[in-house]
Amino acid sequence: FELSARGRSEMVICSKVRGLEVELITNVFASRRRVAWLLGADEAELHKAFQERATKPLKLRVVPDGPVLEVVEEGEEVNLHCLPLIKHFKHDRAPYITSGIIISEDPETGVGNMSYHRSMVHSNTELATSLHSRGHLWRLLNMVAERGEHLPVAMVIGGHPLFMLAAAARVGADVDERDIAGGLFGEPLEVIRTPHYGIGVPATADFVLEGIIDPQARAEEGPFGEFSGYSSDRSTNNVLRVERILRRRDSVLLDVAGGNSPDHLNLARIPRESEMAQKLKERFPDV
């Protein structure tokens, strides 16, 4: 926020942070020019470059191994309190995962869904998370709830910035955002299958939490500093039970600055404005 107030947007890398054993990287998306560079475009053409690539998805590629499988913790080894997390604002209830992307797969079609959900540690093996946007993940959770089942999921913490942008794209339930990521990369996203539920996650991710969301379980979370610039305790209070943690040996904490920071807003804004520009172009060709 201090950088933003001074009109600066540098990516921040902190090698030593009190309470963390890994490097902290944040403010990645604060610069539109930096995101445009990732797409090989000028800043003025950012929305066009994103849309051109996102509308040419490439099917993910499953690989047998990857750095994210270098360390696997399960059973009594799982302790979410050991995750490198930071508290973003004074009134946040606890340290939060702000960059966590929950990946689920439709039990009927196998199509994957990626979405962001703020999450805080509730116990050694449970995250309290909010699905208050009520998107595709909410639909899938209700689908399995009607069957009396749980929803297998994998939360990715720390991925390539283009993968993170793909997770923020607004697409139909029949479109797999992992394929959108492939379109943004210009080559298929390489994924490994998680050990138990077989969910495709980036082979190079820093951390992956594999487990289930129990449709019936609840745990309070919030307040948390939201994009509106206000602290909000609006939440569905869902519970993600983590059964195993996968991580790289050289993992880092890739954090998204909370609140109404440029980092946070651009992550959501760039895919959204690209979609809107395309729809305006279809309706008004001269725009």
For each feature predicted by the language model, list its residue ranges.
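Extended, highly charged
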Residues: 1-224, 229-239, 244-287
